[in-house]
Amino acid sequence: MSRIGKLPVAIPGGVTATLSKTALTVKGPKGELSMTFVDEVSAEQGEDGIVISPRDETKKARAMWGMQRALVANLVQGVTAGYEKNLELVGVGYRAQMQGTSLKLSLGLSHDVVYDAPEGITIAVGKPTEVKITGADKQRVGQVAAEIRRFRPPEPYKGKGIKYVGEYIRRKEGKKK
C-alpha cells in the first residue's frame, strides 16, 4: 500500500476542485490548474478531500497511485500559495534586469541574453544578481528556472555562472605549475 497515495488531499477554503471521470480542475486565488489522470488510478471527492486509489493491484498502478496523489497535492499548493525558485548570478559583470515582461541578462557574452517569461510565470529582479521566478504550476516554474540557468551554468573552477540559491557547486583545483 502506498504511504503517499493513501492520504487524501485536503481542499482548503477558497479553493474549488472540479472532478470529472479522468480530469481534475482546481481554482484558487493564484489561478486555475488542471490535470488528467492516468488510466491506472481513479479519483473520488469525499468529505476530507480528494482520494486517489488504484484500479487494480498491478505494479504500474501502485507506482502511479502515489505519483498522481502528489501531482494533485502540487495543484492545490500551487493555486493557494504558489511556487518560487530563486536564482543567483555569480561573476564579475553578471547582471539581470527586467524589460517589461522580458528578462535581460548580461553574462559576459558578446551580446545580452533576453528571455521572455511564459504565460502564468512572473519573473522579478530584486538585486541585479538575484532573479525570482514565481507561478502556480510547479513544473513550469522549475522549467523556466532551468532554462535561465542553462544560459550560463556554474563552472567548477571559479564558480561563475547562474545557480540556484542554496545550490552547492562542487569546486575543482586548478592546474599545477
From Swiss-Prot:
Keyword Ribonucleoprotein: yes
PROSITE patterns according to UniProt: RIBOSOMAL_L6_1
Gene Ontology biological process terms in this record: cytoplasmic translation
SUPFAM superfamilies tied to this protein: Ribosomal protein L6
InterPro entries: Ribosomal_uL6-like, Ribosomal_uL6-like_a/b-dom_sf, Ribosomal_uL6_a/b-dom, Ribosomal_uL6_bac-type, Ribosomal_uL6_CS
NCBIfam families membership: L6_bact (TIGR03654)
Disulfide pairings: none
Similarity comment: family membership: Belongs to the universal ribosomal protein uL6 family.
Protein name listed in UniProt: Large ribosomal subunit protein uL6
Taxonomy of the source species: Bacteria, Pseudomonadati, Pseudomonadota, Alphaproteobacteria, Maricaulales
Keywords per UniProt: Ribonucleoprotein, Ribosomal protein, RNA-binding, rRNA-binding
GO cellular component terms given for this protein: cytosolic large ribosomal subunit
Subunit-level organization: Part of the 50S ribosomal subunit.
Gene from which the chain derives: rplF
Function: This protein binds to the 23S rRNA, and is important in its secondary structure. It is located near the subunit interface in the base of the L7/L12 stalk, and near the tRNA binding site of the peptidyltransferase center.
